[in-house]
Amino acid sequence: MTDGVPARGSLRSRGAAAVSAYTLRPITSVIPPERAWGLWLSRQIIARIMGTFGPSLAGTRVEPVDTRLPDGRRVKGEWVYGPRTPTSETERSSTTVGAIYYVHGSGYAVCSPKTHRRLTSWLSSLTGLPVFCVDYRLAPRHRFPTAADDVRAGWDWLVTACGVPPKQIVIAGDSAGGHLSVDLLLQPGIEHPAAQVLFSPLYDLTFALSLARERIRPDPATSAANAVRLVGLYHSGVELTHQRLTLDVAGGPPLPPTLIQAGGAEMLQEDARQLAADIQTAGGRCELQVWPHQVHVFQALPRMTPEAAKAMAYVARFIAHALQDARALAEEAR
């Protein structure tokens, strides 16, 4: 745990979690993600919640990307520029000082760069950096390892086609996007970025950790059983023991400096704790923050919880320091 995290959640955030427990959780528990109408409804509900409680910042500019790498791999996504962040059309190259590569959450099946524009526009505005959010293909139409391969393609495009040095990039992701981000950094041939930021990362795809937490206190938004069904749309037909599903972080190379934030009311807080411990076991530096009484990816819902602004301000400082440290190391190596 780090300084700056309050000992208790605000009255508004605690109230929002309580309301969610009596409204959203009962709804998500009966929607069948395996059915086409159930998945469609889940996507609509999540998009409405994120649009209502976490709208994009006014003045945000978005540039769609749909291109291919020389080897034929397709890259889709969007550049997001928060208010006052230089764009590709300005005289100063927008990626001169660095960029953020964002991998959105989704349970691999329900979200998109559009649903996450509050997070990406906020990250851009607070850091002054452009954010590239990859639009990876979703399950069940596209199963494992499609999303992971799309995330790799997006990274390769950012580094090669856009010419952004890895040490000037910070990778960030939430929920399933956290799992995809870590998977990327464990792949051979990947030069690590300056840092990694994870919001409520999914780490244990068996959801055993979530189930253990659920026995102590239920998540106000969903259940472990429902999450298993949703994520199963992605890895169906593949054993969870696969090395790109059950990630061997503890036995792998040290990951770049990492900040993990999770909510104290969510079941994935146990994933956050385990991932942080495994990063440290492998020799990496990891800062873990569990914010009391906060829901899953609360940073994306500032109209619901005032703690979102405090958490994001901390993230911006972490990113600034990480890029500064990376530049200093590069200067020393010359």
Kindly label every feature range from the protein language model:
Residues 72-334:
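Alpha/beta-hydrolase superfamily serine-hydrolase fold, recognizing
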